[in-house]
Amino acid sequence: MKELFKIFVEGDADKRFISQLLEFLFKTSIDQGNIIKTSGWNCLVSPKTEEVYVNQMNRTSADGGVNLVIFDADADFEDRKKKLILWKERCHVDFELFLFPNNKDTGELEDLLEKIINPENQPVMDCWTSYEEALKQVVLPWREDTPLTLPAKKKI
């Protein structure tokens, strides 16, 4: 059976969010093989790994399906969009593009989640923010003035 879509995301949190969102919206389980974790936008466009993604996209397109790339805009929405469109043209692949948090601003999935959180859960977010701020204050001699951060939250 031919797949109708493939969604390319950066990481585990993105995959989990997209999967749960689609299941909620369409009231059906989503084949996890249709959501592909690339381990970051650099891996998608890297000459060492891009062939895997190009082949997957071309196969989906040949089967009449749609490819969707959903990545973080990070620190520069326009730059990230431009680089991904240039890669798309260079590799002759077809995909739709959406950049978190809202397809127009800089940011990432976590920024979107912070905006849509249920107000009842805001104390959890406040606690988490305090924890992140406390990590920045920790000084470790071998870190050479590099603050501690959480792996899932990139510094923008």
For the regions a protein language model found, what residue spans apply to each?
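C-terminal accessory helical subdomains adjacent to catalytic cores in phosphodiester-
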Residues: K2, S19-K37, E51-I156
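Short hydrophobic beta-strand that contains or immediately precedes a catalytic carboxylate
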Residues: L4-E10
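Short beta->alpha linker loops
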Residues: D12-A13, K104
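Short N-terminal binding/cap micro-motifs at the start of the first secondary-structure element
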Residues: D14-I18
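Conserved helicase/translocase motor-coupling segment
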Residues: W41-T49
